[in-house]
C-alpha cells in the first residue's frame, strides 16, 4: 500500500471514541460469513455464508446474494440494533477477489443488496483492512500485544498489519492450500492429499511460499515482529510443535527453527501417522502441514526468527465502525458503485464530496 493511502488509513481510524458519534451499524463480510456490530449496542452477531467456495469454484457470488440480503436484515434484528442507525458493510478478501474478476458484476450485486437490505456494502482495500486489524488487535489483546504487527490468517486472505504499514494477499488457509494442491497434486480439490511429501515436493512447496510471500518483505519495514492471533496457529501449529518437542512447556511463542524441524518431520508422514503423533482437533489436521509452510514462509519473508502467539477473535468491526470515510461513501453509495466500476478498489480512496453521479 502506498504511503499516501496508509496515511489516509491512519487518519480515518485515529479517533475511535464513539460516545458522541452518530449511531452506526457495521457488517464485516468475510470469506465465510458476516458479523455485525453497532456503536449503540455491545452485541456482535454473525451468520455463516461461504463466499470463498463459490469464487474458487469459478461460480462467482451470485448464489450468495439472496442469503446475504436475508442475513443483513436478520442480523440487525437479532442484535437489537436501533432501526435509525446508518448501515455500512465492508467486503473483504472474497469480495476483493470478485472485484478483480469482474468489477461490473460485483457493482451490480452490491446495488441489489443495498436496494433490498438497506446496507451499503463497500469493497475494502487490503491496506485499510490492515488498519482495521491492527486497531482490533490492540483493543482485544491490550498489554499482550507487544509486537509491531499482527499476523491474521483467514480462510481467504492473510494480513500482516501494523500501525503504519501493512501487507496482505489472497493467501489465507484455504487459498494457500489451493496453491499447493495445484502445484503438487494438479487438483483444485480442498483439502487435497498433500501428504506424504517427497523431499523434492517439500522443496517445491517452500519455493512456492517464498515466491508468493516475497513482496511482504519489500512492503514492510526492515524490522518486523509478529503476533499471530488466528486459530490455525493458536490451536493447530503451536500445540502440534509443543507435542513434537515433548517438553510440556506452556508456550506463548514459536521459534522459526522449531517450525522448520516440525515441517521436515511431518512432511513425509501419512495424515494418519501425523494425527497419531501430534493429536489435536480433527478439523485442523487436513491443513496443518500447509499452515506450517505458510507461517514459515511469512517468518522468512519478514526476517523473523520468532512468532508470538495470542488467540483472539479478531473482527474488522471496530475499524469499520470508526471509519468516517466508509460511512461517507455509504451515504453516496450510487456514486461509489459508479466509481467502483471504473476504478476498482481505488474507488474507496476518492472523495465522496466530489460526487456528481
What are these regions (language model features)?
Residues 20-43, 137, 141-170:
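Gly/Thr-rich phosphate-binding beta-strand-loop-beta motif of the actin/hexokinase/Hsp70
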Residues 1-6:
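Bacterial N-terminal signal peptides that target proteins for export
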Residues 14-18:
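N-terminal signal peptide c-region/cleavage motif recognized by signal peptidases
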Residues 31, 49-52:
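N-terminal extension/subdomain marker
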Residues 55-73, 95-147, 162-357:
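Helical "lid/coupling" subdomains associated with nucleotide-phosphate turnover
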Residues 41, 76-85, 115-116:
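Signal peptide-proximal N-terminal region
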Amino acid at each position: 500500500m502506498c504511503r499516501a493511502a496508509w496515511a489516509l488509513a491512519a487518519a480515518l481510524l485515529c479517533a475511535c471514541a464513539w460516545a458522541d458519534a452518530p449511531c452506526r451499524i457495521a457488517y464485516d463480510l468475510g470469506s465465510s460469513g458476516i458479523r455485525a456490530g453497532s456503536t449503540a449496542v455491545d452485541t456482535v452477531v454473525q451468520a455463516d455464508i461461504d463466499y470463498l467456495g463459490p469464487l474458487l469454484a469459478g461460480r462467482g457470488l451470485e448464489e450468495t446474494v439472496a442469503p446475504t440480503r436475508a442475513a443483513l436484515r436478520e442480523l440487525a434484528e437479532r442484535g437489537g440494533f436501533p432501526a435509525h442507525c446508518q448501515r455500512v458493510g465492508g467486503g473483504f478478501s472474497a469480495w476483493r477477489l470478485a472485484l478483480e474478476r469482474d468489477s461490473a458484476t460485483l457493482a451490480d450485486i452490491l446495488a441489489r443488496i443495498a436496494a433490498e437490505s438497506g446496507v451499503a456494502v463497500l469493497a475494502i482495500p487490503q491496506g485499510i483492512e490492515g488498519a482495521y486489524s491492527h486497531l482490533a488487535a490492540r483493543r482485544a489483546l491490550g498489554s499482550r500485544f507487544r509486537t509491531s504487527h499482527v499476523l491474521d490468517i483467514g480462510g481467504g486472505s492473510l494480513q500482516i498489519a501494523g500501525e503504519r504499514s501493512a501487507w496482505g494477499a489472497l493467501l489465507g488457509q484455504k487459498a494457500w492450500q489451493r496453491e499447493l494442491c495445484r502445484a503438487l497434486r494438479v487438483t483444485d480439490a480442498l483439502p487435497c492429499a498433500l501428504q506424504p511429501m517427497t523431499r523434492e515436493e517439500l522443496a517445491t512447496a517452500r519455493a512456492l511460499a517464498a515466491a508468493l510471500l516475497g513482496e511482504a518483505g519489500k512492503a514492510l519495514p526492515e524490522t518486523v515482529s509478529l503476533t499471530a492471533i488466528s486459530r490455525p496457529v493458536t490451536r493447530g501449529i503451536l500445540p502440534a510443535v509443543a507435542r513434537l518437542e515433548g517438553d510440556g512447556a506452556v508456550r506463548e511463542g514459536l521459534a522459526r527453527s522449531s517450525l522448520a524441524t516440525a515441517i521436515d518431520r511431518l512432511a513425509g508422514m501419512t495424515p494418519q501417522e501425523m494425527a497419531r503423533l501430534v493429536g489435536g482437533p480433527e478439523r485442523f489436521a487436513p491443513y496443518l502441514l500447509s499452515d506450517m509452510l505458510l507461517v514459515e514462509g511469512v517468518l522468512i519473508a519478514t526476517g523473523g526468527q520468532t512468532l508470538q502467539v495470542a488467540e483472539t477473535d479478531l473482527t474488522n468491526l471496530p475499524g469499520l465502525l470508526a471509519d468516517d470515510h466508509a460511512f461517507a461513501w455509504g451515504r453516496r453509495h450510487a456514486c461509489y458503485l459508479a466509481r467502483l466500476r471504473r476504478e476498482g478498489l481505488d474507488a474507496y480512496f476518492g472523495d465522496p464530496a466530489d460526487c456528481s453521479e
